Regions:
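ATP-dependent carboxylate/phosphate-activation module, predominantly the ATP-grasp catalytic core
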Residues: 1-27, 68-83
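Short amphipathic alpha-helical segments
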Residues: 10-13, 22, 26-34, 88-89, 158-164, 349-351
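Catalytic cores of soluble metabolic enzymes centered on carboxylation/carboxyl-transfer
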Residues: 29, 52, 69, 73-300, ...
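Conserved metal-phosphate-binding beta-hairpin within the catalytic cores
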Residues: 38-69
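N-terminal accessory interaction module
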Residues: 295-319, 326
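Catalytic P-loop NTP-binding/switch module of NTPases
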Residues: 317-355
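Structured functional modules or segments
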Residues: 343-425
Length: 425
C-alpha cells in the first residue's frame, strides 16, 4: 500500500499472489541479478497489472536495489530467516545455509511505517523534539525504531520514525494485531500518521484485498486524512493538566482575567476557595484560539470547552510551556494563549523570550536597546500555517536578540531578552 509512490504498508505474502506468479517473479529476479553479475543481498521490484487478476505474464521490471529494503522484516517474519545475517554471510564469502526450494512461508505479516507527518494537512512533514515515545510489547509483534524519546526529528532526513510489524496465522488477524498495536502506540511532539495507519488497517476494501496503489488517495476522508474538528475533550483535559501542574500560572491567569490584584484567585494555594467561581481565559489548541471555562469549588476543578463530549482516556504529557495530549490516536497541543503575558509575573519568568513552538520567524519588530512596554508585540512566528505574536512580558529594554527574520527555530529556542528597569537582580 502506498501514498504518493511512498510505501506505508507492506505485507507478506502479497494478497492475490499465486504460486505460479511467485515462481515467475522469483526466477525473473534471479535472472536480473545474474545478468549484471551481482552477488549479495538485493531487492528486485516489479509492478503487476491486477485488473484481470494477477498472472505469471502480467508483471514488469521496475528497479533493483543492491541491498535489503525497509520491508525486509515481513519476509523474515513469515520465513523465520534472518536476512541481515545472511547478508553478512554473503559478504564474508560464505555459502547460504538453505536452498530456495527449502524456504517455507508460515502465516502472514504486515508492516506499518510510522512517519513524522500530518495526515490532516496534506501529509506535510513534521519536525521537532519527541516529547513522548512508547510502543506496545506483545507476542508476534516487532518494533524497529530509529529515534529515542527526547530526540529530534529534523527536516533534513527521511521522516521515518519507526516500523511496527505484526505476524499472525492469517492476514485479517495480522491486520487486527497491527491495528491494536497502533492504537497503543504513543508518539507526541511531531505530528505522526499513527492514527491514519490504524484506520487503514481497518478499511474494508484493504482488509478484503480489494485495493491498488491508488486506494489511499481515493479514500483520504474515510481514513481521517482531512482536517478534523477540534478535539474539545482532549483540549479540556489539557487545560486541566496545565492548571493542576502550575499553580503560579493559575494565579497569573486569574489575576489577568479579573484585573483584581488582591483577588483570592491570585493566591498560590491550590484553588483553596470556599465558594465556587468561574474563570474564563483563552488558550491555544493546535494554534486555534479557544476559550476555556474553569470552575473550582475548593475540592474539584471542572474545565469546559463548549461541548466536550463524554469522558474518555486522554494521555497527557507536559513539556515546558505546552501540554501534549493523545486521545484515540490523535494529538492535540494546549498552550496558554499569551505565553509571555503569563511570564510577566516575577515568579514565572525573567524576561527571556523563547519560541513557544517550532516554526519560522516571520518578523522581528524591535532592535537591541529599544524601550518596550508590557504586552508590546516583539516578533511573529509562523507555525502550522498560522502566525503567532510574541509579546513583552515586562516593561524594559531589549538587551539581546538572537534571531533574524526567516530563520527556523525549535520550540523553547531563546529568541531575545528584555531587561527590566534597573537590570536583573
Amino acid at each position: 500500500m502506498q501514498r504518493r509512490h511512498q510505501k506505508v504498508i507492506e505485507e507478506s505474502p502479497a494478497p492475490g499472489m499465486t504460486s505460479a506468479l511467485r515462481q515467475a517473479m522469483g526466477q525473473a529476479a534471479i535472472d536480473v541479478a545474474r545478468a549484471v553479475g551481482y552477488v549479495g543481498a538485493g531487492t528486485v521490484e516489479f509492478i503487476a497489472a491486477s485488473a484481470a487478476g494477477l498472472k505469471p505474464n502480467g508483471f514488469w521490471f521496475v528497479e533493483m536495489n543492491t541491498r535489503l529494503q525497509v520491508e525486509h522484516p515481513v519476509t523474515e517474519a513469515v520465513t523465520g530467516l534472518d536476512l541481515v545475517a545472511w547478508q553478512f554471510r554473503i559478504a564474508a564469502g560464505e555459502t547460504l545455509p538453505l536452498r530456495q526450494e527449502k524456504v517455507a512461508l508460515a502465516g502472514h505479516a504486515v508492516e506499518a511505517r510510522i512517519y513524522a507527518e500530518d495526515p490532516e494537512h496534506g501529509f506535510l512533514p513534521s519536525s521537532g523534539r519527541i516529547v513522548a515515545l512508547k510502543f506496545p510489547a506483545a507476542e508476534e509483534l516487532r518494533v524497529d525504531c530509529g529515534v529515542e524519546p527526547s530526540g529530534t526529528v529534523t527536516s533534513h532526513y527521511d521522516p521515518l520514525i519507526a516500523k511496527i510489524i505484526a505476524r499472525a496465522p492469517s492476514r485479517v488477524e495480522a491486520l487486527d494485531r497491527l491495528a491494536t498495536a497502533l492504537d497503543a502506540t504513543i508518539v507526541l511532539g511531531p505530528r505522526s500518521n499513527v492514527r491514519f495507519l490504524a484506520e487503514l488497517c481497518r478499511a474494508r476494501g484493504f482488509r478484503e484485498g480489494n485495493f491498488d496503489t491508488g486506494f489511499i488517495d481515493r479514500n483520504l476522508a474515510a481514513l481521517g486524512a482531512a482536517p478534523q474538528a477540534l478535539d474539545r475533550g482532549a483540549a479540556a483535559a489539557g487545560v486541566a493538566r496545565l492548571l493542576a501542574t502550575d499553580q503560579a500560572r493559575v494565579a497569573a491567569l486569574a489575576r489577568a482575567a479579573s484585573d483584581e490584584r488582591h483577588s483570592p484567585w491570585s493566591a498560590i494555594d491550590g484553588f483553596q476557595l470556599a465558594t465556587s467561581r468561574q474563570l474564563e481565559f483563552p488558550v491555544l489548541v493546535n494554534g486555534e484560539d479557544v476559550s476555556a471555562r474553569v470552575c473550582h469549588n475548593g475540592q474539584a476543578m471542572v474545565v469546559t470547552i463548549e461541548d466536550t463530549g463524554p469522558a474518555e482516556d486522554v494521555i497527557a504529557v507536559e513539556d515546558g510551556r505546552a501540554i501534549y495530549l493523545l486521545r484515540r490516536g490523535r494529538q492535540s497541543v494546549v498552550r496558554t494563549k499569551d505565553f509571555d503575558a503569563v511570564d510577566a509575573d516575577p515568579m514565572l519568568g525573567d524576561g527571556v523570550i523563547v519560541a513557544p513552538m517550532h516554526g519560522k520567524v516571520l518578523a522581528v519588530l524591535v532592535e537591541v536597546g529599544a524601550q518596550v512596554t508590557r504586552g508590546q508585540q516583539l516578533a511573529v512566528i509562523e507555525a502550522m500555517k498560522m502566525e503567532h505574536a510574541l509579546r513583552a512580558p515586562i516593561d524594559g529594554t531589549v538587551g539581546e536578540i538572537t534571531v533574524t527574520a526567516g530563520r527556523q527555530v525549535g520550540e523553547g529556542a531563546r529568541l531575545m531578552v528584555i531587561e527590566p528597569p534597573g537590570g536583573f537582580s
